[in-house]
Amino acid sequence: MTSIDINNLQNTFQQAMNMSGSPGAVCTSPTQSFMNTVPQRLNAVKHPKILKPFSTGDMKILLLENVNQTAITIFEEQGYQVEFYKSSLPEEELIEKIKDVHAIGIRSKTRLTSNVLQHAKNLVCIGCFCIGTNQVDLDYATSRGIAVFNSPFSNSRSVAELVIAEIISLARQLGDRSIELHTGTWNKVAARCWEVRGKTLGIIGYGHIGSQLSVLAEAMGLHVLYYDIVTIMALGTARQVSTLDELLNKSDFVTLHVPATPETEKMLSAPQFAAMKDGAYVINASRGTVVDIPSLIQAVKANKIAGAALDVYPHEPAKNGEGSFNDELNSWTSELVSLPNIILTPHIGGSTEEAQSSIGIEVATALSKYINEGNSVGSVNFPEVALKSLSYDQENTVRVLYIHQNVPGVLKTVNDILSNHNIEKQFSDSNGEIAYLMADISSVDQSDIKDIYEQLNQTSAKISIRLLY
């Protein structure tokens, strides 16, 4: 703790009070007796104890797909060994690289299948530096006791802004006019070009992105309807509708913000396009499986749909490159790109400097907390379990992290093993077939740690164990 100049601190406090007070307000500085206690108060703050794992070497992190530098900085500050690649890896190389790492960070192109994950003998957690987690075999990861984290918040604004840009671009046919002028054609027209003020935006999925989009759209004068499978409080004057058909019938623009699940696959197909207003527009910046693109193509050709903006596709190129978005990837590509007023972008919804920086911080922080403290808050496949950080004055305290099958009798078995020590705190929760127990036990020495580890390792319901001290 650095020394503190009490006089400077007192003067700074007085200046801050004077600047923040209203005209004529009377402010008094802290008493000298209070200021004299400041160093003692600051020194009394209990800083979180940096824990280390038992029976594990240095933590190794593998980062793929050009994960943001903010994540690398956070991991290196923790003392982890970081291996970084700008692109995804071929499966054979990925299998080789993943064998001895404790955590891996990916974006949307890397596929962590059961075939890959079965070779990851030391893997503790996975960080998806994006919203989606469908590129990870979550069931297999869970069965192995591997926690998976994502970034549900950080790119929400960037995606919402892209959709706003696409709404205006579709309404004014900006994509077509730009292409024409790039090829030397001057085509100044007003036919079928509209202001967005007074039009109705229908949002399918009113989560982090959908709700932010709602606020931005209303600020531009759009009326907002939204459909969600759960009842969600509206922001502003937006209104929730009870059925998807009602939203489709009433909306001039329809935008999707839903995850890729069996229930959302092709949720906009021929019947839904038929239910939409004549001349409506479709925007998909969520997942490539939620819109049936061949049906969309037919609806555009029939002049039922006046235009569409797509940022995601059922199959996407593994890396950047000319000619990679073609009919071999998706059989309808040539037909789609030939249509008028179709805006196609290469999955860039969250591709802003701000979003990637925030995602790096959000996911790297979650992974670090899980590695260092066992905190699983924010995991997409684990129960959310957390205990207060240990402090440095808890010298002989060990944190037990026990991931196990969700079957009867486990807590009794574990507590019998821990009963010779003082269990200071304990938290257990379950999620489907997996359960997670976290316990802080005191009065433990090095020989006790080894004995506890070996006993827990022999329990029949054990999936994985970590002891932090």
Swiss-Prot record:
Gene Ontology MF terms in the entry: alpha-ketoglutarate reductase activity; NAD binding; phosphoglycerate dehydrogenase activity
Domain ACT: start-end pairs: 399-469
Signal peptide segment: none
Catalysed conversion reaction: (2R)-3-phosphoglycerate + NAD(+) = 3-phosphooxypyruvate + NADH + H(+); (R)-2-hydroxyglutarate + NAD(+) = 2-oxoglutarate + NADH + H(+)
Function as written in the Swiss-Prot or TrEMBL entry: Catalyzes the reversible oxidation of 3-phospho-D-glycerate to 3-phosphonooxypyruvate, the first step of the phosphorylated L-serine biosynthesis pathway. Also catalyzes the reversible oxidation of 2-hydroxyglutarate to 2-oxoglutarate.
Pathway listed: Amino-acid biosynthesis; L-serine biosynthesis; L-serine from 3-phospho-D-glycerate: step 1/3
Alphabetical list of CDD domains matching this protein: ACT_3PGDH, PGDH_3
Keywords: Amino-acid biosynthesis, NAD, Oxidoreductase, Phosphoprotein, Serine biosynthesis
Keyword Repressor assigned: no
Database matches in InterPro entries: ACT-like_dom_sf, ACT_dom, D-2-hydroxyacid_DH, D-isomer_2_OHA_DH_cat_dom, D-isomer_DH_CS, D-isomer_DH_CS1, D-isomer_DH_NAD-bd, NAD(P)-bd_dom_sf
Note: Present with 7670 molecules/cell in log phase SD medium.
Transmembrane segment boundaries: none
Keyword Amino-acid biosynthesis recorded: yes
Sequence similarity: Belongs to the D-isomer specific 2-hydroxyacid dehydrogenase family.
EC number: 1.1.1.95, 1.1.1.399
GO BP annotations listed: L-serine biosynthetic process
Name the UniProt record assigns to this protein: D-3-phosphoglycerate dehydrogenase 1
A cellular component term, taken from the record's GO annotations: cytoplasm
Residue list for modification Phosphoserine: 22, 29, 33
Taxonomic source organism: Saccharomyces cerevisiae (strain ATCC 204508 / S288c)
Positions annotated as active site in the UniProt record: 287, 316, 347 (proton donor)
Highest taxon listed in the record's lineage: Eukaryota
Annotated residues for binding of NAD(+): 208-209, 228, 285-287, 311, 347-350
